[in-house]
Amino acid sequence: MIEAILFDVDGTLAETEELHRRAFNETFAALGVDWFWDREEYRELLTTTGGKERIARFLRHQKGDPAPLPIADIHRAKTERFVALMAEGEIALRPGIADLIAEAKRAGIRLAVATTTSLPNVEALCRACFGHPAREIFDVIAAGDMVAEKKPSPDIYRLALRELDVPPERAVALEDSLNGLRAAKGAGLRCIVSPGFYTRHEEFAGADRLLDSFAELGGLAGLDLTAPVA
């Protein structure tokens, strides 16, 4: 029987990436720099995981204003803006997520987050979408800079599994991106993928299931662990 479900956050629990993009752009404007990430550029930047890493990549190639602050400070300001936007209640969980989590809790299945986003972002999402602190929803939260290498490295999933004390063959990961799929499979997990707005163009070879919506799972019954791990 399945013992744990590990969730990515951005694009998986909720469609947050447009709000992240808005937070980046509003932060850039507040800092007085002529940077603006449109959807096409942001989609490309998302192939690099981690907000600080995206800013660094952007700075290596952009020809506009230089960075007004260290990257970590820019990212900190963006996180504060994102948390404020989340508090305005503009984001809802993706279809099927709330029911799956509720059913898993009733069944005694442990829940974890394994994400490259920061802990404050996870907390903001949980308070906005669940009305509770993250620790009241998830047994383990592996986030942000808790590991040295971000997805597609499997490190964040390995950390979550260690904290859960659950072997990968007794757990399943839910993801929305190719980097997330690679991270989950690298940790020995089965992985169910439902692409988000910014990842629908990606190829998901190796996914154990590929869904248009997590609502298609039909709850725990859809977490099929009978097939061997790819």
Swiss-Prot record:
GO terms for molecular function: hydrolase activity; magnesium ion binding. It catalyses: D-xylulose 1,5-bisphosphate + H2O = D-xylulose 5-phosphate + phosphate. Its EC number is 3.1.3.-. GO terms for biological process: xylulose catabolic process. The active site is at residues 8, 10. CDD domains: HAD_CbbY-like (cd07528). Its cofactor is Mg(2+). InterPro entries: CbbY-like, HAD-like_sf, HAD-SF_hydro_IA, HAD_sf, PGP-like_dom2. Changing residue 42 to A: 40% to 80% decreased catalytic activity with xylulose-1,5-bisphosphate, but no effect on activity with ribulose-1,5-bisphosphate. Mg(2+) binds at residues 8, 10, 176. Substrate binds at residues 8, 17, 50-54, 75-78, 115-121. Keywords: Hydrolase, Magnesium, Metal-binding. Pfam families: Hydrolase (PF00702). It comes from the Bacteria. The keyword Lipid biosynthesis does not apply. It is an enzyme of class 3 (hydrolase). PANTHER family: CBBY-LIKE PROTEIN, XYLULOSE-1,5-BISPHOSPHATE (XUBP) PHOSPHATASE. Belongs to the HAD-like hydrolase superfamily. CbbY/CbbZ/Gph/YieH family. This is Protein CbbY. It comes from Cereibacter sphaeroides (Rhodobacter sphaeroides).
